[in-house]
Structures are given as structure tokens and as C-alpha cells.
A protein has these predicted regions:
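Redox cofactor-anchoring modules in respiratory/redox and cofactor-processing assemblies
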Residues: 140-174
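Iron-sulfur (Fe-S) cluster-binding modules
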Residues: 1-142, 159-163
Length: 174
């Protein structure tokens, strides 16, 4: 059962204070409890933008290269379930002026089908690929992985049936 919208709105109101809340985790017991409840089992990776900038060196061009967008596209192609959030909770919470708020996270996997429909919608594989392309063109960077916090705030599970692809901006996102 997904979480109600009021819970998401509460998170949006707390989000601007995330750095203060993060500092509280320096208190040993608060840090241990927070890690256990919200982050245990996380496996997240930021993928750099699709560009290579050589610095003062001559480089041979490799025959093949996996670009970060190809990693994301691989998982989209393999997934049976695709679900796009209709806003970025980070950018909406921070009232971002530099990047589109409507380019939200993409969730893959069976658990994504339990997300509250007021937050977004299921999409086809082609729509998911188009979504990440628009995110890249907007200058957003992909964060991909399994995130326990997403299963908590979205009220879904199991976590091993959900893969999150966030589309992060440098000014608002975690």
C-alpha cells in the first residue's frame, strides 16, 4: 500500500532542512538509528554526464565505451515495469528556478506499480527512454540504485523489486 499524499507533502516541507537533519546524525545513537531505519542496504551510484574532457593529454579513442546514459538505458530495456514521477521532490521542495521540476524520478521494477498514482504514472519502455533523454538534455545527472528511503517514503516494497533512477540537479538534490 503506497503512502498517502499528506506524507509526501510532509517530506517536501522537511526537505529544505535536510542538512540540519543530516548534522544531527553525528550524534552516535541518532546516526546509528538513522542508518538502520533509512539507509541500510542502499546501493546508489551517481553516473556522470555523457562527456569526456581530456586535460593536457593525448588520448587514444577506445573502440567501445559504455556511457552513463547507456547504463541507464540498459536497465530500462531489461525492466518489465516503468513508472515516472510527475515531479522531482527535491526540486519542488527547494522551489528550483534553474531546472525543470516536472522531470522526476524513474522507478523500475514490480514494486513501482504500488506507488500512489497521484505522484506519477506507469509508462512504456519507449516513454521511459524518452524521459531520461529529456533529463539529460536538461543537464540533469542520473543517480541509480536501490534506495531503502524510497521504499519508505513511497510506502512500497519489497526493496529488491525497486530500482530508482533519480535525475539530479546540482543545486537541490541530495
Amino acid at each position: 500500500m503506497s503512502n498517502p499524499i499528506w506524507f509526501v507533502k510532509l517530506l517536501e516541507r522537511l526537505f529544505p532542512h535536510r542538512f540540519l537533519l543530516a548534522r544531527l546524525t553525528h550524534i552516535p545513537i541518532v546516526g546509528k538509528v538513522t542508518d538502520h531505519l533509512l539507509f541500510e542496504g542502499d546501493d546508489l551510484i551517481y553516473l556522470p554526464q555523457d562527456r569526456v574532457i581530456p586535460v593536457n593529454q593525448a588520448l587514444d579513442r577506445p573502440d567501445e565505451m559504455v556511457l552513463p546514459s547507456q547504463v541507464v538505458e540498459h536497465f530500462i530495456e531489461k525492466a518489465s515495469y516503468h513508472w515516472v514521477m510527475n515531479f522531482c521532490i527535491c526540486r519542488e521542495s527547494m522551489r528550483c528556478k534553474d531546472y525543470p521540476i516536472d522531470l522526476g524520478c524513474l522507478f523500475l521494477g514490480e514494486a513501482a506499480m504500488g506507488i500512489n498514482p497521484q505522484l506519477g504514472r506507469p509508462v512504456t519502455k519507449a516513454e521511459a527512454l524518452e524521459h531520461v533523454r529529456r533529463c539529460r538534455e536538461a543537464g540533469l545527472v542520473h543517480l541509480i540504485g536501490r534506495n531503502k528511503l524510497d521504499t519508505i517514503w513511497l510506502g512500497i516494497g519489497p526493496g529488491d523489486k525497486l530500482l530508482t533512477i533519480c535525475n539530479c540537479c546540482p543545486c537541490c538534490c541530495l
